[in-house]
């Protein structure tokens, strides 16, 4: 499964919560722009900023029911959709965020398969928020029978989560992407992005399309 907490997987969950029909992730801005010319709704950003020709940026608050309900949305972001491209050989890729943490864990347990958590990071670099989510999800899965891990990165992410979860929003003041969004005036989505279990959707990428399987 994939985590891009700020902001792609959180925003994808919000889109399905508000009634989007399906999401078509694309890896390049050129492909996204071509889809726009074909009449699709397009959400696209670069380095956090909405592109002028796109209908939406990458904020969960963009995706209201009025804007996307019942529609197909093309999606291209700096980190999230590129991570999907990296992982697309997997049979299924679930989209994980704090907003669907429990629903996602339950879905993964029902799937009864090995779980790999891919943190999208920032331009192929480590980021705090995705690793915090990985720790939260790992800790939750380990409460279910049959789940174990001897992965150092999983253990480290759980340790990070244990420290940060005492006061998550305060801890996130350290996060580099938190400051990037603040400089762009886009940090209004921070509290929402770290709210736990506000939706039961489980967006899953399969055969080139993301649909809600929750």
State each model region's role.
Residues 46, 115-118:
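A polyampholytic, Gly/Pro-enriched intrinsically disordered region
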Residues 94-105:
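Short, acidic/small-residue loops that bind anionic groups at enzyme active sites
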Residues 77-78, 97, 117-121:
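Short, structured patches in soluble enzyme cores that scaffold and shape functional sites
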Residues 8-17, 30-73, 77, 81, ...:
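Residues that scaffold, gate, or flank divalent-cation-dependent active/transport sites
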Residues 1-3:
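Short hydrophobic beta-strand that contains or immediately precedes a catalytic carboxylate
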Residues 120-130:
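Phosphate/ribose-phosphate-bearing ligand recognition and processing surfaces
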Residues 55-92, 106, 111-112, 128-214:
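Long, charged alpha-helical interface segments
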Residues 16-25:
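Domain-level signal for Mg2+-assisted phosphodiester chemistry and nucleotide/NA-binding surfaces
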């Amino acid at each position: 499964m994939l985590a891009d907490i700020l902001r792609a997987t959180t925003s994808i969950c919000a889109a399905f919560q508000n009634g989007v029909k399906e999401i078509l992730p694309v890896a390049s801005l050129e492909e996204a722009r071509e889809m726009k010319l074909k009449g699709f709704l397009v959400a696209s950003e670069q380095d956090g900023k909405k592109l002028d020709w796109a209908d939406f940026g990458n904020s969960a608050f963009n995706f209201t029911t009025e804007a996307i309900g019942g529609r197909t949305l093309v999606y291209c972001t700096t980190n999230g959709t590129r991570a999907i491209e990296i992982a697309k050989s997997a049979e299924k890729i679930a989209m994980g965020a704090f907003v669907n943490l429990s629903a996602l864990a339950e879905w993964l347990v029902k799937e009864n398969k090995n779980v790999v958590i891919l943190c999208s990071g920032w331009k192929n670099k480590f980021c705090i928020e995705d690793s915090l989510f990985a720790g939260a999800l790992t800790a939750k899965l380990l409460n279910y029978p049959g789940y174990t891990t001897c992965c150092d990165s999983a253990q480290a992410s759980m340790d990070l989560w244990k420290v940060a979860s005492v006061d998550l929003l305060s801890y996130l003041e350290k996060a580099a992407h938190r400051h990037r969004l603040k400089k762009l005036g886009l940090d209004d989505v921070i509290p929402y992005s770290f709210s736990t279990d506000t939706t039961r959707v489980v967006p899953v990428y399969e055969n080139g399309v993301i649909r809600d399987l929750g």
